[in-house]
Amino acid sequence: MNWQQRIVCDPKILAGKPTIKGTRISVELILGWFSSGWTTEQVLESYPNITRDDILAAFAYAQELLHDDGILPMAEAAA
C-alpha cells in the first residue's frame, strides 16, 4: 500500500494532522474508530467519501510511523 498517494498533511487542515486526501478525516480518527470496535463496513457506510484503500492507507501510514520511531514511553512490565 502506497499511503503517500492518499495521506496528506496540510497546516490549514486539522492543524497539519495527517488526513485522507481531499477530506478532513484524520488518520487518528480512523484508528480511533477501529480501536472502538467499528468494522470497515461501518466506516464506509458512515463516511461514503472515503474508500477501503483510504482506510488501508491510514493503517500503512501508522505502521510506518511506528516502524521508524513512533514508540511512546511506557512503564516497565512487572516481573
What are these regions (language model features)?
Residues 1-2, 73-79:
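Intrinsically disordered, low-complexity and often Lys/Arg-enriched segments
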Residues 52-76:
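C-terminal structural segments of small proteins and small subunits
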Residues 1-17:
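Basic, low-complexity segments
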Residues 7, 25, 65-66:
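Exposed, low-complexity/repetitive linear segments and helix-based recognition motifs
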Residues 1, 9, 48, 52-53, ...:
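Intrinsic-disorder/low-complexity regions
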Residues 15, 19-20, 24-61:
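Amphipathic, hydrophobic secondary-structure cores in small proteins
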